[in-house]
Amino acid sequence: MRFSLELSHHLWTRDRDGQAPQRTLDVARAADAADIDAIWASEDPEGWDAFAILSAIAAVTERARLGISVTSPYPRHPNSLAASVATLDRLSGGRAILGLGRGQVEWHRDALGIDIGDPLAVLGETVALLRQWWQAPHRAISPVDGCFQIRGWERVIHPVRDDVPIYLAAAGPRALDLAGATCEGVIFNAQTSTDFLRQALPRVRAAAMAAGRDPAGFSFVLQTTTAVVDTPDAERKAIDRGKNLLALVSTLPGMDRLVRTESFDVPALLDKVRATMRTRDTLAAGGGFPALRRNGDLTAARALIPDDLIRRLGIIGPLPVVREQLRTLDELGVTHVAVAPPEDATSVESWRRLLADLGQ
């Protein structure tokens, strides 16, 4: 199992002294020097430009793979995606990974005015178009009844590699099948349950084999952040962060299936949390995460969510507990897991100790 650093724009929203951009680069530089496997930058419609962030990180790192987790062909047309990935791959010396997903279609359709069509068909065609642009003769053509109607468009800037890996963010059965048949990996959202993973990973492998592909080299990336905590106060903070995440993300349409577990009545719980967070009303009005935070009551939502559910969905605890949780995920076939930065996140030695403790 390998570990990754997950970067989010949220740190920048709390930037009071203008140092957040430099700190982002410093943390990435330290993690890379400590031999972290990958650095991922999230991309939400209201946030930063993940390709710009990773291009800057490419200039201060040497080893780590650099991935988007995840972008969507709705706000980023496939031609723009092809250009951005090729540019990042060139700047990084062949280290780019594309994390691709449909995103929250309600935001694209209702707030940004984008025609979404059939999201799965859009994703499948996007993957096919990107492969055509990245491989000689670098000319892409959509199917006759395609979603984009690309008519022989040729690109002149290509990635270092013609097989840049594409990882699909997948939750539903059809998306898992598409990932296995056409991509190199799957990205599972933070707090995906082991119950879900036990069903999903074999399905992806079966889809790969059915498409004549070898699933042995497939990557399964879990975005759940590994948090080693040694005090009750540190655990409390980690659990509350997990509750916030559950209230804001797992209540969105299509996300609840990832967090279902036999130990809890998750559908009933999420219905209560949605009501407290006013999730449906906010989405219907075209609101994104800023509106969800304003309109919902996170304090009340946290009170509804059992601590033990977050412990079950997370990777939280003292080092021996975390190691056991990681061992379980490794046995399931998860290949990559996110890790919370050490307290001194700009220290190479702190990163090395953390990764060594976790077993990398």
Regions found by a protein language model. Name each.
Residues 1-3, 36-38, 61-66, 90-97, ...:
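Short, well-ordered coil/turn segments that N-cap beta-strands
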Residues 1-66, 164:
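N-terminal beta1-alpha1-beta2 module of alpha/beta enzyme domains
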Residues 3-9, 39-41, 66-69, 96-100, ...:
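Hydrophobic faces of well-ordered beta-strands that scaffold small-molecule active sites
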Residues 17-31, 81-84, 170-178, 242, ...:
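Short, acidic/polar
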Residues 35, 57, 88, 130, ...:
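Conserved, mostly hydrophobic/aromatic
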Residues 117-157, 197-202, 206-328:
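An alpha-helical appendage that flanks or caps ligand/catalytic pockets
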